[in-house]
Every structure is written in structure tokens, then in C-alpha cells.
Amino acid sequence: MIEESSNASAGPVVLRDAVPADAPGIASIYNDAVRHSTAIWNDVEVDAGNRAEWIAARRRDGFPVLVAVDGDGAVLAYGSFGPWRNFDGYRHTVEHSVYVRGDCRGMGLGRRMLAALVDAARVQGRHVMVAAIDASNTPSIALHRQLGFEESGLVREAGFKFGRWLDLLFMRLQLDERGVDERSVQASAARALH
């Protein structure tokens, strides 16, 4: 996947598959979110080696990791999706994450990244994409609504960061209109009996 656009402040911005050399830039964006936001509900920062392993694991499991880079190759944003839950019944559902470097927010990179991930999930034949968002993150909620996501649940006080409880909003986007055929129902029932 390679998609290019131009931005006056950053020059040409390319959306492409991440490579190991992008790991330091991804780690920097991740760590900024750990330190300064509730976009990530982790307290521990990571290094480039951790992110390189993460990229490799996502790829090994068949999931994309995308980056938006400027003309110098600096990582401006990244995104991925992976399993929503690790049970067979959820195999058609994925959960995504998108993070944009602080000085690059408001340039449309989050929208481009999320749209590219939605496209990739459709190509993979996924059925639903889930977003798990801090319920006070109104810009992220608005972006997801603009791309067709709908609110599907709220878990109050599900997380804790910066000395306060955080509410978790789930949003979902149905990626296709497939129904359920009788053979699938019978096969699932047969597996459940064994």
C-alpha cells in the first residue's frame, strides 16, 4: 500500500507499509501518547526494539502496520489493526489503533490512516472494525463518526490513568453486508459439540 499526498508544512506525505527502520519513529509517537494523553492506557514507554518486534508480530499474524512519512522519511503517524478478542467467534472482527505525532495533528493524517486501515480490513474480508476510545476524546469520536463508525457501548471507569478513572467508548463500523449461511451455522455447532 502506497498513497501519496502533499502538505505544505511537511512536503509530500506518503502512506505505506511500515518497515523495521520506522520503529524509532513509531516508538517516539507511542511514548508521547503514553506520557501526555489518554489515547493509550499504558504507563510504560517502549523502545525501538519493542516496536520492531511489534511490527514483525503483526505482519506474521497477517495484520497491516501503516506509516505516514514525510519527504525525509520521518514517521508522522502510524496505524494498525489486529484481533479484537482471541476467541474463534471473533475472527471476523478487528480492533484498530491510529496515532499521529503531536505537531502533525489537524493535517488529516488520522483520517487518511483510518480510511486506509478500513480499506485493508475490507480487502482481508473482515466483517466489523472496532474502535475503543477514551470517552472524553471528542476529536477521535468525531473522526470515527465522519467515517461511518457508530457508538455501540460505554464501559464506565474501565481504565485508570493520570490519577483518574477513564470511561471506554466502543464504536463499530460494519465492513460488509454478509449474512450467515446455514453451513456456517452447522459447522460452528458441530465444533462446539466436540
Residue ranges of model-derived segments:
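Conserved acetyl-CoA-binding loop-helix of GNAT-fold acetyltransferases
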Residues: 106-119, 142-146
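Conserved catalytic-core motifs of GNAT/GCN5-like acyltransferases
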Residues: 80-83, 130-133, 145, 150-167, ...
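Acetyl-CoA-dependent GNAT
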Residues: 44-103, 114-115, 174-175
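Conserved GNAT acetyl-CoA-binding A-motif
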Residues: 121-133
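A short beta-loop-alpha structural element at the N-terminal edge
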Residues: 14-26
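C-terminal "cap" of GNAT-fold acetyltransferases
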Residues: 92, 157-194
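Conserved GNAT-fold acetyl-CoA-binding loop/helix
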Residues: 27-55
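Conserved beta-strand-loop-alpha-helix junction that forms the acyl-donor binding cleft
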Residues: 105, 131-141
